[in-house]
Regions:
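Short pre-active-site segment immediately N-terminal to the catalytic Zn-binding motif
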Residues: 91-105
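Boundary at the C-terminal end of the N-terminal hydrophobic targeting segment
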Residues: 29-36
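Active-site recognition of the HExxH zinc-binding catalytic motif
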Residues: 89, 105-113, 117, 179
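Catalytic zinc-binding patch centered on the HExxH motif and its immediate surroundings
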Residues: 71-85
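Extracytoplasmic and endomembrane cell-envelope/extracellular-matrix remodeling and assembly machinery
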Residues: 36, 41, 47, 69, ...
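Bacterial N-terminal signal peptides
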Residues: 13-27
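Catalytic Zn2+-binding segment of zinc metalloproteases
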Residues: 101, 111-128, 146
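Membrane-active amphipathic alpha-helices enriched in small hydrophobic residues
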Residues: 131-146, 151, 155-167
Length: 363
């Protein structure tokens, strides 16, 4: 199911079902009780992720499909894989990463889970655990019936559940270690430094501690341990490939775009004040002024950006969105047509143009 968010213009999808991944919280959910996640479709961000992921999948000998990339509307630091080699990246990961090397490390780590067959193995382990859980419930019921004591049943079931949890999490830690090792090899093959992966892991660890979460693999979906960071420190020392000196302009634009669409306008303008005349900052300003309905300011900045980069399809897409959202359908069609001419294979641009066409000619 898809719908258009009338505030951001991003396409949002809701996916319901059991995501069989390394997420601990999904480990004990049934198909019926699994939570929904909100997804965002954005051509510019997905193109960036595709450029990052394609060489990693190639190095891992995994078929690449752009449609396997999903952006999760969640500001936490996380990424995970699902069935069918689907890659899910949280918006928080993109917004809080310092550079594309950190994103490459995250994607390489998740690709390591695919290489290790961890999704299928996790499914099998969960099925086995469900059978054990059912057996413990039956045993507890039998004990209660035989002794007349309900506490006997509770003790049996609690003991079984505790053992299952410990076994599951110990297994998960081993999977994370395996994925780290595979990721370092993939980064080596693609001539990228593992420094970003190390730095991002440290970022997660710092955030956990700031949030009052002690390092405890029993309550983390991707447990950060001193051993893992030490392993990556060693990998960084041995790697012949340096980390990028600074983030690319492309990555900075994506961070600015996501921030401008998803964060509070006041926070966005603190991050990207009007005094900042860089392209990423002005991109963010154009978006946030649009959200604040300061359309003249938004279009003035956006027209300047288009004058500087007339062949940038994403600037034309944004201008089309502004016109579309404010009921100016014909100019919206013109901008969407321009964006599509610059990026003719974009399914999202085709949808934008088709929607504008329907609005312009409803009959």
């Amino acid at each position: 199911m898809e719908k258009i968010n009338r505030i951001t213009g991003f396409f949002r999808k809701t996916v319901t079902g059991l995501i069989c991944s390394v997420l601990l919280q999904s480990a004990f959910l049934s198909d019926a009780s699994a939570a929904s996640i909100s997804l965002i479709s954005d051509e510019e961000t997905e193109q960036f992720l595709a450029r990052q992921l394609r060489p990693v999948f190639k190095a891992a000998d995994i078929p690449f499909n752009r449609n396997n990339i999903y952006i999760v509307n969640d500001d936490s630091l996380n990424a995970f894989v699902g069935d069918g080699n689907n890659m899910f990246v949280h918006t928080g990961t993109l917004m809080k990463a310092n550079d594309e090397n950190e994103i490459a490390g995250v994607l390489a780590h998740e690709t390591g889970h695919i290489m290790g067959g961890h999704i299928l193995r996790q499914k099998i382990k969960l099925q086995n655990m469900q059978q054990i859980s059912l057996a413990s419930m039956l045993a507890g019921g039998a004990a209660a019936a035989a002794t007349g004591r309900a506490d006997a049943a509770i003790a049996i079931m609690m003991g079984t559940q505790s053992s299952m949890l410990n076994a599951m999490l110990a297994y998960q830690v081993e999977e994370e270690r395996s994925a780290d090792e595979s990721a370092v090899k993939l980064l080596q093959k693609t001539e990228q430094s593992p420094a970003g992966m190390r730095n991002f892991m440290k970022k997660i660890d710092r955030q956990n501690r700031l949030n009052g979460i002690a390092e405890n693999p029993y309550f983390r979906t991707h447990p950060v341990t001193a051993e893992r960071i030490s392993f990556l420190n060693n990998a960084v020392r041995q790697s012949p490939f340096p980390a990028p000196a600074q983030p690319s302009n492309e990555f900075l634009r994506i961070k600015a775009k996501l921030s401008a669409f998803m964060e509070e306008p006041r926070k966005v303008l603190q991050k990207y004040p009007p005094s900042d005349k860089s392209t990423p900052a002005r991109y963010a300003q154009a978006i946030v002024f649009f959200r604040m309905l300061k359309l003249n300011q938004s279009l003035k900045i956006l027209n300047e950006l288009i004058a500087e980069e007339p062949e940038n399809p994403y600037f034309h897409e944004l201008k089309g969105q502004i016109f579309m959202e404010t009921g100016k359908i014909k100019p919206a069609r013109t901008e969407y047509q321009k964006a599509l001419s610059l990026l003719p294979n974009s399914a999202l641009f085709q949808i934008n143009l088709a929607q504008a066409g329907l609005e312009d000619n409803p009959n």
